[in-house]
Design a protein with these regions (language model features):
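Catalytic or ion-coupling anion/metal-binding cores of large enzyme and transporter domains
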Residues: 2, 11-17, 50, 56-62, ...
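A short, small-residue-rich loop immediately preceding and capping a beta-strand
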Residues: 33-53, 64-68
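N-terminal small/polar loop signature for handling phosphorylated ligands or for N-terminal nucleophile
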Residues: 2-35
């Protein structure tokens, strides 16, 4: 039996995509509760599909496996890798500088989507499918197999066979998605340079599983984990290269080697993580790093609190050397930046007034967008992706510190 779910695709559903995640969850729960279904394969892809599926699996608690549709092939523009999402932010800046025209902008954007599949960067789609695998809810290696590859068809077939066995074994999500499994997911998400949206989604999945899990766990468990995957936006490569270098299993083996994740946990295979990862994996050291040659020593999320917000998340893996040198180089206070706050009342106001000379935005300004949270804007929208005014971009200032009460794109390198 096949059945659809509520459709979700971030850019097509903005600003309501987070609400659509919950609608997708509800539609899945109604079908899984309302029909005599013994087990389910949850097909996922773009950003919100995976958390919606895992939330439903947690609520209904019948045998379930997550089967990702897989990322697109690597894209190229003028001989260089073109990552979905990341190249859009780059193209927007080039257009603002006047270095490309609109037709060239569209060519750049189109180059990042060379095939079927979800985003080929380590955006929210690849991050959440990797998290599903880290939780033990996908067959090993499933998350990053490119959509057009024959291996994607093979793992789909294996997933179909396995769900039948899981029904007979009564292997349910509650036996797999334990507290320790969520701890593993945080560590893996940090090591791969995962999307900041993982924090929101994983907390929601845990809540539906009845597990106490909050934002402070992200810093406690993940902040000191090194960046092991050299993929955009935190690195250089894309998902096709990550797959060829062993994918999530390669990262988990390195984490096991350094005793950073729990190994004796049940997975959808009916085996433990250790048993799943017995085979030797051929790794490209340029793509998947070891602890000794990691891209960054600390790649996890920082949880911040202040007198004007209760909690905030910073994705440290995308903070560039240029940004650190410019804003975070005070030897007395290396993680403190002092600057003028420029406040916008929502993304519409930001786009309308960003280039206004009256605001006097300079390189020592902090861009703030407010009114975009769960209450003030539909479902905490993904609209906190801000770039400097055009005149600063033309001077070579490509980033400013930003702050907002909504969410950022998983492909954004905006600090």
């Amino acid at each position: 039996m096949e059945f659809p779910t509520h459709p979700i695709q971030e850019t097509g559903k903005r600003p309501t995509a987070m609400l659509d995640r919950n609608l997708s969850y509800l539609s899945l729960v109604e079908v899984l509760y309302g029909y005599p279904i013994d087990g389910v394969i949850l097909t996922t892809g773009c950003d919100k599909t995976t958390p919606a599926a895992l939330m439903a699996a947690a609520t209904v608690n019948i045998p379930a496996i997550v089967l990702s549709g897989g990322p697109m092939l690597d894209g190229f523009y003028k001989g260089k890798l073109a990552g979905s999402g990341t190249i859009i932010w780059e193209a927007r800046k080039l257009l603002a500088k006047g270095e490309i025209n609109y037709d060239e902008f569209m060519d750049m954007a189109a180059s990042s989507a060379p095939s079927v599949g979800h985003c080929n960067t380590m955006g929210t789609a690849s991050s959440m499918n990797s998290v599903a695998e880290a939780l033990g809810m996908s067959l090993p290696g499933c998350a990053i197999i490119p959509a057009p590859y024959k291996e994607r068809k093979q793992i789909s077939f294996e997933t179909g066979k396995r769900i039948v066995d899981m029904v007979h074994e009564n292997l349910t999500p509650s036996k797999i998605m334990t507290r320790k499994a969520f701890e593993n997911a945080v560590v893996v998400a940090s090591a791969i340079g995962g999307s900041s949206n993982c924090t929101t989604h994983l907390s929601a999945i845990a809540k539906h599983m009845g597990i106490k899990f909050n934002l402070s766990d992200w810093q406690k468990l993940g902040h000191n984990i090194p960046l092991l995957v050299n993929c955009q936006p935190a690195g250089e490569y894309l998902m096709e290269s990550f797959f060829r270098s062993g994918g999530v299993p390669a990262v988990m083996k390195e984490l096991i080697k350094n005793k950073k994740i729990h190994t004796n946990l049940m997975t959808v295979t009916g085996k433990s993580i250790t048993q799943n990862l017995i085979k030797k994996i051929k790794v490209n050291p340029n793509v998947v790093k070891t602890f000794k040659n990691a891209l960054a020593d600390k790649a996890g999320f920082l949880v911040m609190r202040s007198n004007f917000f209760s909690t905030a998340i910073m994705k440290t893996s995308v903070i560039s050397k240029e940004f650190r040198d410019r804003y975070l180089s005070n030897p007395k206070h290396p993680n403190v930046f002092n600057g003028k706050a420029v406040v916008f009342e929502g993304p519409e106001d930001y786009h309308k007034r960003l280039n206004s000379k009256k605001l006097n935005i300079d390189e020592n300004s902090v861009l703030i967008v407010r009114g975009c949270g769960p209450v003030g804007y539909p479902g905490s929208a993904e609209v906190i992706n801000m770039q400097p005014p055009d005149r600063l971009l033309k001077k070579g200032i490509n980033t400013l510190p930003t702050l907002g009460d909504g969410r950022q794109s998983g492909t954004s390198a905006s600090p």
